[in-house]
Amino acid sequence: SHGKQETDEEFDANL
């Protein structure tokens, strides 16, 4: 996961 605002526990929506 490349969390920008979210953490790495989030999904890869912030690619």
UniProtKB/Swiss-Prot annotation:
The keyword Mitochondrion applies. It is found in: Mitochondrion inner membrane. One of its GO terms (molecular function) is metal ion binding. One of its GO terms (biological process) is oxidative phosphorylation. Belongs to the cytochrome c oxidase subunit 5A family. Component of the cytochrome c oxidase, the last enzyme in the mitochondrial electron transport chain which drives oxidative phosphorylation. The respiratory chain contains 3 multisubunit complexes succinate dehydrogenase (complex II, CII), ubiquinol-cytochrome c oxidoreductase (cytochrome b-c1 complex, complex III, CIII) and cytochrome c oxidase (complex IV, CIV), that cooperate to transfer electrons derived from NADH and succinate to molecular oxygen, creating an electrochemical gradient over the inner membrane that drives transmembrane transport and the ATP synthase. This is Cytochrome c oxidase subunit 5A, mitochondrial.
